């Protein structure tokens, strides 16, 4: 008989359903019991295989055999054994990532450096995310740099302006929290400082009644792309103490220079390339090492020894691609079998050639042995910029001529113009006068006579000519002659005649060299049309000029050559007018020949020449040859 509690339980529908399922369903206790075991056995294997570089997938048959041998799995059915297999998408071998070909090599920690340098370099690379980290050990500078004694300087490149300020601020807080170092960050803009400054700038512009100074999306010069974090390992404690000399006498008070000054220069890529502080400090350290050796009565054996010492002090970032490019550049350089040390530019360097000798087919310096090399010019400019070599006004003009006119295997106009920009910027920083008449003439002349004259130099030439007109340059006779010669070399006849007309614009008389160059340039073209057009207005102006121009030998020869090109038969008719063949011509033909335009000009020239010879102002050709 069913007891009352059982009957009460059977009266509930849910309890009745549970009892029926327990009695009627198949026993699955073993499968339910083995499920956690299978998961516990398989999941660590799958996890280890997914994150490992080695293939740890076991053969399918071994896993099946292992499951069958297990006592707990003995009563399982065929369906349970098949469900124990690993799915197909888990049997795929995980991808293997190849090792990076360009491993970043962090700078090595110098000897006797503060303990904070090691973790600091690691933090700068991993947490701050700065690239191209370099380290300069400047503790040997004597006297020390203005930044502090025993200087160690690091450089890093930030990805953007925002990255620069955020990472620099975190770096200062990291030093304060982990190493108890109170570092200063010059140029750092705080999180809300930029917004505050821009708001003040907008308010100021609104009060002034103009908003044109506000650039949308810009910082308006508030940020510089450069944050300098610096601190000293000795802290801010400065102990003043009395100083005594070698004899024991009191010499004053002072604080001994102790500790190490650490400077971290964080810059954007553009700012770092613009300043190039590594090259500047490298030149300073090199010069200081040489001077200290010389003061002790010693010197480096050779340049290689000095470079080894510099390499141990300066660790610059290097990559495989950069090293390969440097090797290619070094292999492509020309090696000369003679010394070029005595061929430096000097203030007393003469002009390469007179301005009147540049009308040949090629410039004169191309026919002589190479006097200057473009690499030497570049090195000289770097010495002026980095070391501070003195520079005079004449040396400035010679450097510009050397940068533009020196022959080079790679005639890159862009590189030459960049050199000129650098030397002009250096001269302007030193307070030298650069925008005068001589500078305009030198720049235009050097560009026109450059072996790489092309579109880029033409663009720069047009800009210079525009500035020249705006400034109202008043050139002297020699400068006008140089401009005419340079334009004639490039066969730019419009600008050639424009330069020829410059003296009358400023109420100045032309010199005989101007007319001689004009006649000779036209004669060298062998163009009858150009010679006729030039003679019809140049010759009357020459004859009416006050003071008059004497037909001396160079001018006379050039004018005669130009007349011969304009009228090839004039010279023949003038000297052979009495021949029978010409006498037998009809009167109309004879008058036509006698009244030719340039035949009259040639007769006039010959008569003037004869008068000068009778007056003794000009020697005859026979007398000149005899002398």
Swiss-Prot record:
**Where's it found, cell-wise?**
Mitochondrion inner membrane
GO cellular component term of the entry, any: mitochondrial inner membrane
* The keyword Transit peptide belongs to this UniProt entry's keyword annotation: yes
Gene3D superfamilies reported for this sequence = Beta Polymerase, domain 2
InterPro entries in UniProt:
Atp25, NT_sf
Annotated region (Disordered) at: 336-355
Domain of life, per the record? Eukaryota
Transit peptide stretch: 1-51
Recite the UniProt keywords alphabetically: Membrane, Mitochondrion, Mitochondrion inner membrane, Transit peptide
Q: How does it sit in the membrane?
A: Peripheral membrane protein
**Keyword Transcription regulation assigned:** no
Which Gene Ontology BP terms does the record give? mitochondrial gene expression; mRNA stabilization
- Protein family according to the UniProt entry: Belongs to the ATP25 family.
Q: What does this protein do?
A: Probable mitochondrial mRNA stabilization factor.
This protein is called what? ATPase synthesis protein 25, mitochondrial
Q: What is the lineage of its organism?
A: Eukaryota, Fungi, Dikarya, Ascomycota, Pezizomycotina
Identify the coding gene: ATP25
